[in-house]
């Protein structure tokens, strides 16, 4: 996990476009939690769109960083592609 800690910084352009992911046990992906993460990341009041696409299996997935507002910790989960656009 120490290697993955180097990917936590994400640029913040005027119109934010980021990847947000959430999982249970680091393997199964939860759409509901993803939507909550997207809502929180957009400030809780901004409108947003959310989309996901998955491919591959096991180690073919890429690792992304996810910040959990409930625990205050960063966790690393397995996803293929997940994007949140703040309007």
From Swiss-Prot:
Q: Which InterPro entries match?
A: HssA/B-like_chaperone, HssA/B-related
Give the transmembrane ranges.
none
Q: Give the GO terms filed under biological process for this record.
A: sorocarp development
Which is one Pfam family of this protein? Coiled
Domain of life, per lineage? Eukaryota
Family the UniProt entry places it in? Belongs to the hssA/B family.
Its name, as the record gives it, is HssA/B-like protein 57
Lineage of the native species? Eukaryota, Amoebozoa, Evosea, Eumycetozoa, Dictyostelia
Instruction: Please name the gene that encodes this protein.
Output: hssl57
